[in-house]
Swiss-Prot record:
Part of the 50S ribosomal subunit. Contacts protein L20. InterPro entries: bL21-like, bL21-like_sf, Ribosomal_bL21, Ribosomal_bL21_CS. The gene is rplU. PANTHER family: 50S RIBOSOMAL PROTEIN L21 (PTHR21349), LARGE RIBOSOMAL SUBUNIT PROTEIN BL21M (PTHR21349:SF0). This protein binds to 23S rRNA in the presence of protein L20. The keyword Disulfide bond does not apply. Pfam families: Ribosomal_L21p (PF00829). One of its GO terms (molecular function) is structural constituent of ribosome. One of its GO terms (cellular component) is ribosome. This is Large ribosomal subunit protein bL21. It comes from Streptococcus equi subsp. zooepidemicus (strain MGCS10565). Keywords: Ribonucleoprotein, Ribosomal protein, RNA-binding, rRNA-binding. Belongs to the bacterial ribosomal protein bL21 family.
Length: 104
């Protein structure tokens, strides 16, 4: 059974495995930089360890592959018969990380 972990990053929990590429909320790091996730909630595999609230001494190491922005989301507000409308767009920034190791 392959080892996996659940980490907390950007206010969300993400299940990761070694070699997997994940998209997370923007992290201030250059492409190619190595980052460490210290908030590991669960480590699974042959023996599952659940943290209370985090697993002590467990870390997940990854490499930043690229920074980017998601597709544009457009919001449009409109009031009938008043000639009032507002169009606004938003592109959420993200970081693509490739998981290198899970240390439990």
């Amino acid at each position: 059974m392959s080892t996996y972990a659940i980490i907390k990053t950007g206010g969300k929990q993400v299940k990761v495995e070694v070699g997997q590429a994940i998209y997370v909320e923007k992290i201030d790091a250059e492409a190619g930089a190595e980052i460490t996730f210290n908030e590991v909630v669960l480590v699974g595999g042959d023996k599952t360890v659940v943290g209370t609230p985090v697993v002590e001494g467990a870390t997940v190491v990854g490499t930043v592959e690229k920074q980017g922005k998601q597709k544009k989301v457009v919001t449009f507000k409109y009031k009938p018969k008043k000639g009032s409308h507002r169009k606004q767009g938003h592109r959420q920034p993200y970081t693509k990380v490739v998981i290198n190791a899970i240390k439990a």
